[in-house]
Amino acid sequence: MTKHVEIFTDGSCLGNPGPGGYGIVLRYKDVEKTLSKGYTLTTNNRMEMLAAVVALQTLKEPCRVTLTTDSQYVRQGITQWIHNWKKRGWKTADKKPVKNADLWQALDKETARHQVDWHWVKGHAGHRENEICDELARTAAENPTEEDTGYQPS
């Protein structure tokens, strides 16, 4: 039987672009694990995406996943927009390169390993796990240790 894992993610950026971070809560049965990391220069969308990528990469085997994010960009991108981007060779409808294609491709690869049910919650609305992720992401952004090598200034 496939394990069911709950994942909650959030990204934060102090300035956009600026220092950023992600926060993750993973829950399997009654066990919770938190992850976070800060980056010196990035964007809020990249941190939202990276949170989902890292969370899914953390799972050692294919799982049934309920992934909750407060990012419509991530949820809509992976459930709706990505299909046409792939058909067009990672180009938008107006033939421009898809922003954050490196992370979209990583997220696409990870979602193929798992059975993911995407959920959206309003940020800063008292959702327990989202508030934990937000705090983890903000704290990580305030203490960045990594470089976001995929970040490309527009």
Swiss-Prot record:
Binding annotation for Mg(2+) 1? D10, E48, D70
What Pfam families is this protein classified in? RNase_H
What EC number(s) is this enzyme filed under?
3.1.26.4
Return the cofactor note field.
Binds 1 Mg(2+) ion per subunit. May bind a second metal ion at a regulatory site, or after substrate binding.
- What are its cofactors? Mg(2+)
Can you state which reaction this protein catalyses? Endonucleolytic cleavage to 5'-phosphomonoester
Q: How does it assemble?
A: Monomer.
What is stated as this protein's family in its record?
Answer: Belongs to the RNase H family.
**Under which name does UniProt file this protein?**
Ribonuclease HI
Native organism is: Vibrio parahaemolyticus serotype O3:K6 (strain RIMD 2210633)
